[in-house]
Amino acid sequence: MHARILIADDNRDAADTMGMLLELGGHEVIVAHSGNQALELGRQCRPDVVILDIGMPDMNGYEVARTARNEDWGKSAYMIALTGWGQADDKERARMAGFDRHLTKPVDPDLVEEILKGHLVGKRS
């Protein structure tokens, strides 16, 4: 099962690497390098899954998630926070912003694929 995935991270290497790994898994990947660009691309491509870095400079991941959840395309997207911040209050803040999952960097690509599979199987059943 494959998904259309939007990745947003201001660290170009991290975003591009994650994107390449997900493409190897058969997913369609769109990469953004800012929060504003993520919203723009989300409106255009209507992703199934959004993976957002929290610490982006122009618009952080919390703001992007809150904004997306209030837009038609973002209401049904599965949102994953991918961040270096992993304390309990960070996870709660992510949940309150509308994220479905919170993963702490560095993340195991196999874990991301496992989460995606679980989400896609659940979505189709």
Question: What kind of feature is each model-predicted range?
Answer:
Residues 19, 63, 70, 75, ...:
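Alpha4 helix (beta4-alpha4-beta5 surface) of REC/receiver domains from two-component response regulators
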Residues 45-51, 56:
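Active-site beta3 strand of CheY-like receiver
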Residues 16-24:
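Charged docking surfaces used in two-component/phosphorelay signaling
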Residues 11, 54-55, 62, 85:
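The short loop immediately C-terminal to the conserved phospho-acceptor aspartate in CheY-like receiver
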Residues 33-37, 60-66:
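Acidic catalytic/metal-coordinating carboxylates
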Residues 107-116:
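C-terminal output helix
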Residues 15, 57, 87:
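The feature encodes the CheY-like receiver
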Residues 26-33, 41:
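Short hydrophobic/Thr-rich beta-strand motif most characteristic of the beta2 strand and flanking loop
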